[in-house]
Amino acid sequence: METIEGIIVVTTSEIPGYRIVEVKGIARGGVVRATHLGRDIMALLRNIKGGEVKEYTEMMAEAREEALRRMALHAKELGANAVVNMRFATSNLGGSMAEIYAYGTAVVIEREEK
């Protein structure tokens, strides 16, 4: 279980030890990233040689984290304290641009009584 910006985020439909008391709607956060010439040149050279293109891997990892953060902030705006069923979607926007989109169901949860 991960907490981002004070929001619990999980990929499952339930959170052990908690119950969902209210559904607030879809929380979403997206980011579009484009590479720059230096990264493109390094990527081209790595592509010729083969292997992982670390410049793009790092860029996409940063974009995923930012999309998650934006989704958590949107969930907070909706009045939620958790996001369940979180997923990522990616889109190639042409050239060297890509969109990373994080989304899930914003909910209010409470601890279950034992």
From Swiss-Prot:
Protein name as it appears in the record: UPF0145 protein PYRAB04900
Record InterPro entries: UPF0145_dom_sf (IPR035439), UPF0145_YbjQ-like (IPR002765)
Family annotation (NCBIfam families): PRK03732.1
Similarity-based family: Belongs to the UPF0145 family.
UniProt cross-references to HAMAP family, sorted A to Z: UPF0145
